[in-house]
Amino acid sequence: MKTIIKATVMGLMLIASHSALSAETTETSTDKILPYPIYQHKMDNGLNVVTVPFDSPGLASLHIITRVGARNEVEPGVTGFAHFFEHMMFRGTDKYSKEEYSAALKSTGAAANANTTQDRTAYHMTGNSDKLELMFELESDRFMNLKYSEHEFKTEAGAVKGEYTKNFANPYSQIYEKRSETAFNTHTYSHTTMGYFDDIVDMPNQYEYSKLFFDRYYRPEYNTVLVVGDVTPEKVNALAEKYFGAWQRGSYESVVPVEPEQTETRYVHLQDGTIPAYFSMSFKGPAFSDSSIDMPALDVLASIVFSSTSDLYKKLVIEEQIVRSISGGASDSRDPGLFTIHVSMVEKEDMPYVLGEIEKAIARVKAEDVNAALLERTKSNLKYSFAMGIDTPGSIAQSLSHYIQLTGDPESINRLYALYDKVSAADIKMVANKYFTADHLTIATISDDELGVLK
């Protein structure tokens, strides 16, 4: 996943040459950020199969990216089911019970895990490459033949409620939920991946709906099988056809509501005195695109203005010591999301002053060109960070999964990074003026006051 300033998703510009196989597509440019060939194979049922050979003798990482997340939960009363299936997918099938699945998986040397975001659910494992066929058998079986009783469903629903209760005892989780609800009035980004609490409480009564959700979304056209490591595209494609070829395409498409334009600053406050005072500024940002300069320019801006090397950080955290931490960045999302600035305070009374300093920093970046040397250094540092993080099959697969969730195409990583080198001082001023407006701002605060300090 993308961090605040994309520190884990930037990379060094490396040269890669690609050869094409008759059954796959590759792009054959020499200016790609990822130094390994990406082979794609589209099956007749709509399943996308991606192979990235990597020098990791005896190891392979298998990821399945299901492009279904909280974003797709458009029906009232049943939020949280994308995350719920992250749990249910380990319940077993007629062929492999939960215990048999775990035992078979253990024989591959792999451990399976999963996670959910607003835009996708991802399942992943890394094991012995000579056991890849068994991994395919296990994964195809549960994706095509998942089976669970109503009792098992209710048991897992109770576990999800417990997870929510534990997570949202944290004030930061509470303000995240409140900020989402406040910033988005119509779009499904208004609820977290956990879902609304009332829906989670009612989840045990939604057994029939759970089967409908699985039938709608656990279909080949929503999924990408990604394999990275000591493999060949010929072998991976053959296994995909063998084990996923019978998977039937579905017909359901969710219609995600469009968020109307925000026209005034919104405020939300959480009264809590158990943590240091906190506030955030969330501006409406763009949807992810691998063809627009906006997101790369915002990422570079975030590093220059809000990172730990920025002038603002040095002043507020190091010199004046009135702020514990400050960071900021845009979220990668399929639909327009948020650029959020997070501030942890030393004293709540200094919130108005710190807000004013942030506004001054934004005003400067709107009006003045950033230093040319700083701009080039920032772009290089961001790209170098990526290069340091793609040294295992799992880390490469995780990076590619991020872009598959956004566009369905792993080559987006290469197209995006071609844009990073093109970011100019004028682009940074442009996005600052375009997105950092009071009408598109949501301010969230935490303090022991009944009312927020900043409203």
Give the role of each language-model region.
Residues L62-T126, H191-G195, F306-I322:
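M16/MPP (pitrilysin/insulinase) zinc-metallopeptidase core fold and M16-derived inactive scaffolds
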Residues Y252-D311, L419:
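His/Glu-based metal-binding/catalytic segments typifying zinc-dependent metallopeptidases
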Residues K42, E100-Y252, E319-K455:
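Charge-rich, well-structured scaffold segments of protease-associated domains
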Residues D31-H63:
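Mature N-terminal segment immediately following signal peptide/propeptide cleavage
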Residues V68-N72, N128-S129, G285-S289, S344-D350:
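A generic structural motif
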Residues V49-V52, G58-S61, A70-V74, S289-D290, ...:
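Short, solvent-exposed loop/turn elements at domain surfaces
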Residues A23-D31:
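Cleaved targeting-peptide boundary
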Residues M1-L21:
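Gram-negative bacterial Sec-dependent N-terminal signal peptides
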